[in-house]
Amino acid sequence: MAFLKKSLFLVLFLGLVSLSICEEEKRETEEEEHDQEEDDKSEEKRFLSLIPHIVSGVASIAKHLG
């Protein structure tokens, strides 16, 4: 009987450890995805801030050609 209790506790302990590891990996993955989204947003903002300069450059070129 004691052997069965020890085995059961061992199985439960190993299950909790593996669950904890999986949750930690999931949390790290979510943080990496969040960081990637923030990087993408900042790149998009930088690109959008360049659009007025590009438009004015194209307009001045068109004015010189036209």
Curated annotation (Swiss-Prot):
Propeptide: 23-46
Region (Disordered), start-end ranges: 25-44
Annotated tissue distribution: Expressed by the skin glands.
Subcellular location(s) of the protein: Secreted; Target cell membrane
Span of the signal peptide: 1-22
InterPro entries cross-referenced by the UniProt entry: Frog_antimicrobial_propeptide, FSAP
Modified positions (Leucine amide) in chain numbering: L65
Keywords: Amidation, Amphibian defense peptide, Cleavage on pair of basic residues, Immunity, Innate immunity, Membrane, Secreted, Signal, Target cell membrane, Target membrane
The UniProt record lists the keyword Signal: yes
GO BP terms: innate immune response
Bias type Acidic residues, positions: 30-41
GO cellular component: extracellular region; membrane; other organism cell membrane
Function summary: Antimicrobial peptide with high activity against Gram-positive bacteria, low activity against Gram-negative bacteria, and moderate activity against fungi. Acts by causing bacterial membrane disruption inducing leakage of the intracellular content followed by cell death. It adopts an alpha-helical amphipathic structure in membrane environments. Also shows highly potent antiparasitic activity against Leishmania species. Shows moderate hemolytic activity on human erythrocytes. Is also active on human monocytes.
Family: Belongs to the frog skin active peptide (FSAP) family. Phylloseptin subfamily.
Protein name per the record: Phylloseptin-S6
Lineage, top ranks: Eukaryota, Metazoa, Chordata, Craniata, Vertebrata
